[in-house]
Swiss-Prot record:
Pathway: Cell wall biogenesis; peptidoglycan biosynthesis. This is Phospho-N-acetylmuramoyl-pentapeptide-transferase. Its EC number is 2.7.8.13. Its main location: membrane. Keywords: Cell cycle, Cell division, Cell inner membrane, Cell membrane, Cell shape, Cell wall biogenesis/degradation, Magnesium, Membrane, Metal-binding, Peptidoglycan synthesis, Transferase, Transmembrane, Transmembrane helix. The chain crosses the membrane at residues 26-46, 72-92, 94-114, 132-152, 168-188, 199-219, 236-256, 263-283, 288-308, 338-358. InterPro entries: Glycosyl_transferase_4, PNAcMuramoyl-5peptid_Trfase, PNAcMuramoyl-5peptid_Trfase_CS. It is found in: Cell inner membrane. The keyword Oxidoreductase does not apply. The gene is mraY.
Length: 360
């Protein structure tokens, strides 16, 4: 929005030309989202406490979590607000990729909000019925995927980028819609499952978003895209603004979510952030890269699948409790140790993922 205004004002003062630089807008996008999160934090926490929107804690969970009961939740609202405002201010409003991300972000945020509302207000521990949650998540994911397929049919925008292999980018055709669906819905749920400890989900989200900011910049630059043998996508550059907004909003939220947390993001935050990372990976044609950089989310999800599958097939559990972060808690690891070690692993995976762009 401000970019368009600056384009009209540059004729009167050349200094407004700085708004045309992607690097400048990326930095101010991050700072804008960060400051909005920091400003909203105390006000949001006080409001949630006044409304008694407190966290519901399972009775069969680790005993250390019982003290978290009543901690304000639904703090993801401030994350979504910070991201949306920052993106609308600093990204080109005419960019279709930006609107794709905002559609998934806000759509999944609404689904998460309804889920949280049922849990904390109606005291329904199950929240939104699972089939309805997946139905609406699927509607949004399939709608966006179908629109992208129609817009990018038989172009690099619907090719599959395979890591480690130079110029191996098969055209997916209709399989693009199916892949996009699973990536968006799967990542939304994966981040949701990871959000079980103070700050555990938000920092890997920040790391992955930062990694995708670099990938988006390279993908939107023809010279670097050709150098790295990845598809050049002319709309991809503006995703840098979206990614840096996620980084800023995430760091601002972490200020209040770090152990011991003053607020939790709730499903309104985790589903939205996961869906946003998923659609960004789809837009950049880097679904495989998301699996590497978001390895923490993948392992958390696999631990639940393996736990449920093992119990149904063999009547035995593999882990003491799933997702796997609870397994380490029950082994005696202090919560901060689990969190920080998962952060370190996440950072390593993001760096490894970025390195694969050159190893071809």
């Amino acid at each position: 929005m401000l970019v368009w205004l600056a384009e009209h004002l540059v004729k009167y003062y050349s200094g407004f030309n700085v708004f045309s630089y992607l690097t400048f807008r990326a930095i101010v996008s991050l700072l804008t989202a960060l400051f909005i999160s920091l400003w909203m934090g105390p006000r949001m926490i006080a409001r949630l406490q006044k409304l008694s929107f407190g966290q519901v804690v399972r009775n069969d969970g680790p005993e250390s979590h019982f003290s978290k009961r009543g901690t304000p939740t639904m703090g993801g609202i401030m994350i979504l607000t910070a991201i949306t405002v920052s993106v609308l201010l600093w990204a080109y409003p005419s960019n279709p990729y930006v609107w794709c991300v905002l559609t998934v972000l806000i759509g999944y945020g609404i689904i998460g909000f309804v889920d949280d509302y049922r849990k904390v207000v109606r005291k329904d521990t199950k929240g939104l019925i699972a089939r309805w949650k997946y139905f609406w998540m699927s509607v949004i994911a399939l709608g966006v995927a179908f629109a992208l397929y129609l817009a990018g049919k038989d172009t690099p925008a619907t090719e599959l980028v395979v890591p480690f292999f130079k110029d191996v980018m098969p055209q997916l055709g209709l399989l693009y819609i199916l892949l996009a669906y699973f990536v968006i819905v799967g990542t939304g749920n994966a981040v949701n499952l990871t959000d079980g400890l103070d700050g555990l989900a938000i920092m890997p989200t920040v790391f992955v978003a930062a990694g995708f900011a670099l990938v988006a910049w390279a993908t939107g630059n023809m010279n670097f895209a050709n150098y790295l043998h990845i598809p050049y996508l002319r709309h991809a550059g503006e995703l840098v603004i979206v990614c840096t907004a996620i980084v800023g909003a995430g760091l601002g939220f972490l200020w209040f979510n770090t152990y011991p947390a003053q607020v939790f993001m709730g499903d309104v935050g985790s589903l939205a952030l996961g869906g946003a990372l998923g659609i960004i990976a789809v837009l950049l044609r880097q679904e495989f890269l998301l699996v590497i950089m978001g390895g923490v989310f993948v392992v958390e999800t696999l631990s639940v699948i393996l736990q449920v599958g093992s119990f149904k097939l063999r009547g035995q559990r593999i882990f003491r409790m799933a997702p796997i972060h609870h397994h380490y808690e029950l082994k005696g690891w202090p919560e901060p140790r689990v969190i920080v070690r998962f952060w370190i692993i996440s950072l390593m995976l993001v760096l490894i993922g970025l390195a694969t762009l050159k190893v071809r």
